[in-house]
Amino acid sequence: MSKNILILNCGSSSLKFAILDPASGDEKLSGLAENFNLVDARIKWKLNGEKGAADLGAGAAHSEALNYIVKNILSAELKDSIGAIGHRIVHGGEKYTSSIVITDEVVAGIKEAAAFAPLHNPAHLIGIEEAFKAFPELKEKNVAVFDTAFHQTMPEHAYLYALPYSLYKEHGVRRYGFHGTSHYYVSREVAKVVGVEPSKVNVITCHLGNGASVAAIRNGKCIDTSMGFTPLEGLVMGTRSGDLDPAIIFFMHNTLGMSVKEIEETLVKKSGLLGLTEVTSDCRYAEDNYATHADAKRAMDGFCYRLAKYIGAYMAVLGDDHLDAIVFTGGIGENAGLVRELTLNYLKLFGIKVDSEKNTAARFGKSGEITAADSAFRAFVIPTNEELVIAQDTACLAL
């Protein structure tokens, strides 16, 4: 019997999990445990098409969630089918340029990179530790798959900030990029569609969800991306500001009297679509009310304008090379037709033309081209599948 891969994505207060067949991509189990360390900690899942849910108990966290999965959700047969465990790790720093089997040295490296991702990497380390306990027989078959790895091919002029060089050399202050697994996956998928070798494809990929980023990919390798030292840089996002004048931070602190913690909270959790609408971080609100509500229009226009600027910039970055495709993915990229249309309409100078009928049809998991036959460049919707990449990388290294 072929072996399946258990995929774990641990957040500070949640745990996403799935079991996939790495060969076929068939999903056997998926679920989410959330509200860790609160009175209403709970878990929900989908197993063989059937949904389930349960309370984990007040104060429950990663350990209780994994124990519940093993004891109450997995059948003996499904548990025995797990051949390895893949962990999504947000930040690998400069050290990790590809997925790797987890050893004590790798754990130390993830811990070291926690300085760059203090909300994420410590939670990933908890997930690794708990996976070792829950599946002791698979301790040497745990694999780390890094969000930052795909972007490690960026040239120096793309990843360095114009800061004192010592900040990079001594403290690692540089642009790292995120969503790498998603950008990698859709770049390979669109290469199949346009009939180009993955190692030769030139594409601009737009991963748009509550977190959002763009990547410029030349010959299958990332040469630039919109997120930077942290996932705060770049596009307008659900609650994150994206790019802004750094001096605004001084103003908020010196003139408005805001503390560093308050400023961080504002930029990370109270800005983006939420800040612009003053109502919600949900893009569906901005899309549904675009024609009638000033706040929705303000947020949608800001989101699409910023995105179009990045796409245009990356068309320039690709230089003399051709552009095979622009790809939209992620929850917003795959479903928000208005976002795609408004964004691409900013790029008419490049000869890009949207086919409204195709654009409207490409949603709810449907992939397809959304540009007209006479468009100078092609744009596609490609649903992402980060779990499949994690499963395949894990299988390659540990099975």
From Swiss-Prot:
Pathway: Metabolic intermediate biosynthesis; acetyl-CoA biosynthesis; acetyl-CoA from acetate: step 1/2
Subcellular location as annotated: Cytoplasm
InterPro entries to which the protein is assigned, alphabetical: Ac/propionate_kinase (IPR004372), Aliphatic_acid_kin_short-chain (IPR000890), Aliphatic_acid_kinase_CS (IPR023865), ATPase_NBD (IPR043129)
CC cofactor: Mg(2+); Mn(2+)
Chain residues that bind Mg(2+): 9, 386
Keyword entries, A-Z: ATP-binding, Cytoplasm, Kinase, Magnesium, Metal-binding, Nucleotide-binding, Transferase
GO molecular function list: acetate kinase activity; ATP binding; magnesium ion binding
UniProt keyword Cell wall biogenesis/degradation present: no
Pfam families: Acetate_kinase
Taxonomy, superkingdom: Bacteria
Family under the similarity heading: Belongs to the acetokinase family.
Protein name: Acetate kinase
